[in-house]
Amino acid sequence: MSTILMASQQDPVDLWRDSLAKEMPELGFRAYPDVGDPGDIDYALVYWAPHGLIASLPNVRAVFSIAAGCDHVLADPQLPPHLPIVRMVDDYLAAMMAEYALYGVLHFHRGMHYYRREQLAARWNRAWPLYTPDTAVGILGLGAIGGDCARKLGALGFQVHGWSRGPKKMDGVTCHHGPDGLLEMAGQCRYLVCVLPLTSETQGIINSELIAAMPQGGYIINIARGGHQVDEDLLAALDSGHLGGIFLDVYNQEPLPPEHPYWRHDKVWITPHVAGELVPRSCAKSVAANIRRFEAGAPVPDLFDKSRGY
């Protein structure tokens, strides 16, 4: 019987234990700090695990990330370099992220930011609506989450563009790639939604150059990682009027410090990194399926690729 060790400072241990038991009753489960014999552990299920914990497990075969990204795993300087890391790829997580992206786009598209200001001033004013079929949304990142966002925004009638590092094809989406394609897409889109993985290539991608390429009065929604955005460039574009507003769920420093100007800026809407919450009942299916693949010696489709950074 294989055993998995869970180590997370924020995820519900009992829900994970029960959910994994439903999907894989034969799997042993332990939760840090109750490791027991480290040699018993075959798999680690982690989110910001204590540094050195994974290296202390002599027989661990793989690390499962309790997040779509793997930056928290890679932050451990003692992480064994040969160890496979499995990304959390979950349909329900992708659906939640897409819900948030749609909400962010529709918030601005239907003028909710304007109507909130008018409500607080007790003014009965109407804004003329935009024609959705003439309005373009750009998705930065066309993986599982970006693809779901693109399909659902397309179903609402928007023109949908997507950008990725390399060439891609997706039905109903005008696809762009590479540095030139990024600015080309930005120039056509009123709204940009970032769902990229954070890598050395995408760090700071939401910067003054990208913003300047957008039409006057555009909007940005970032639900990926705070490291994608250059805060000073966003604030400057908001204050100049080049950007009409931003909707952020992620930040360069989390929790967002109380003194940060985002809290009080009237063109900024913020939430505390909640766009995609991992629900154990759904994610346990993915974890169990991939453990079975490891046990059978079968290919694991959700492995983190260190050469690509995601």
Regions found by a protein language model. Name each.
Residues 217, 223-310:
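Rossmann-like dinucleotide-binding domain for NAD(H)/NADP(H)
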Residues 98-114, 155-156, 286-294, 298:
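Oxidoreductase and adenylate-handling cofactor-binding alpha/beta cores
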Residues 29-40, 51-54, 173-188:
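Short acidic low-complexity segments
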Residues 115-148, 175:
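Glycine-rich NAD(P)-binding loop of Rossmann-like domains
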Residues 42-116:
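Phosphate/diphosphate ligand-binding glycine-rich loop within oxidoreductases
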Residues 155-172:
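NAD(P)-binding Rossmann-fold cofactor-contacting core
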